[in-house]
């Protein structure tokens, strides 16, 4: 389920997240969320292409499927190869796939602005998903904004600094992410906040949604833990916790976008 990029989804006057998963959440919102409609055959053309431009990242996130490291991996695509990849995406019929540049930390890539400018010049819609590290500066944000990025995503994996910082591996990351959200709003850059639900942070789900609303996020995306990379060492939700989460997501479905929740439709029916 993917909510349309609409600024009111998380800032609707009078809206508030319902209670803790497992309690007695509020009633059905009364209408279905808007969705971005896919009108082409996904067997012939991807809808979104997510390119991990580097494995380099200063953080050591517990769930990282890429097992990011402090330096680029051997075999990372060169700038010329990156241009070739972008050219391949424009070989499809319009509308072209959306391109998301991530990592690792995409800000670790020295030619990030060039890749964005080239993709935009070819008619691609480009978003980025950087890590919030000392590389996340106003100058870099302005540079990617001027290159053509109009949307970015960041991660907020806890309702509190204690939980988020433990998840990301560095103290102060929560506060820096909050500051980054304020910076993006000042610069007029739309952003979404992502979170991965695990047994360690699910108790803070309502607070994470509230934080996303208060910080002015355009969307709040939730993911279930995929036990791969460093994430293989984390505890997944129990069956009962997963069921509670699905009901909670359903009751907040006008404000939350979900990824890989294959049983959510069944819970919509049961609701």
Task: Go through each PLM region and give its residues.
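Long, compositionally biased low-complexity repeat segments characteristic
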Residues: 17-19, 262
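Single conserved hydrophobic/aromatic residue that forms the stacking wall/gate
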Residues: 263-271
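C-terminal scaffold of the Radical SAM
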Residues: 215-218, 231-261
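Conserved alpha-helical substructure of the radical SAM core
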Residues: 2-13, 17, 25-147, 240
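Short, conserved loop/turn and helix-capping segments at secondary-structure boundaries
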Residues: 76-79, 170-174, 236-243
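Hydrophobic/aromatic residues in well-formed alpha-helices
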Residues: 82, 242-245, 269
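A short, flexible beta-alpha/helix-coil linker loop
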Residues: 68-71, 159-161, 227-230
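Radical SAM/AdoMet-radical enzyme domain recognition
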Residues: 79-101, 109-226
